[in-house]
Amino acid sequence: MAESTTLARPYAKAAFELARDAGQLSEWSALLALTAAVAGDSNMHKVLNHPALTSAQKGQTFLDVCEGKLNEAGANFVRVLAENNRLVLLPEIAALFEQLKAQQEATIEVTIESAFEMNDEQENKLAQALQKKLSRNVNLRSQLNKELIGGIVVRAGDLVIDASVRGRLAKLAEAVNS
């Protein structure tokens, strides 16, 4: 994982700089999401790892699957990745691109796990509180997790706030056992 991130980072940065300079961050985001989905497909994974195919053949097969949904710059990006045998890194490249885009737009992806379904008012209040705390715009995504028993777990980048009953019970059990 760490190695693939290291290999993917320069490609993600290059794609980001190209997209930013062209004013096409959203277009490139969609383009990379598409190519990441194609690269993540199990059949395409077999093609990309097939030893008998040349990198040019792998790249052309990949472009054929995308069926003209890529602009010229996107197709060239795929060709460069194919030449360097890096098409399998597209999911990682797309994820790193999204991180760079979020930094540029001063936004952060926040995942909220809650034991019970949250209504819109609760989500809005939580989003406002997180925006104030993090000094960034927040894209909130909520998930239901009955295992929490009660409360919520907030994940924003490397920040984790565990305000769940399960988390409190785990801390209590740890304190009792030590």
Swiss-Prot record:
GO CC annotation: plasma membrane; proton-transporting ATP synthase complex
Membrane topology qualifier: Peripheral membrane protein
Any one GO molecular function term: proton-transporting ATP synthase activity, rotational mechanism
InterPro entries linked to this entry: ATP_synth_OSCP/delta_N_sf (IPR026015), ATPase_OSCP/d_CS (IPR020781), ATPase_OSCP/dsu (IPR000711)
Localization terms from the record: Cell inner membrane
Assembly and interaction partners: F-type ATPases have 2 components, F(1) - the catalytic core - and F(0) - the membrane proton channel. F(1) has five subunits: alpha(3), beta(3), gamma(1), delta(1), epsilon(1). F(0) has three main subunits: a(1), b(2) and c(10-14). The alpha and beta chains form an alternating ring which encloses part of the gamma chain. F(1) is attached to F(0) by a central stalk formed by the gamma and epsilon chains, while a peripheral stalk is formed by the delta and b chains.
Record-given protein name: ATP synthase subunit delta
Source organism of the structure: Hahella chejuensis (strain KCTC 2396)
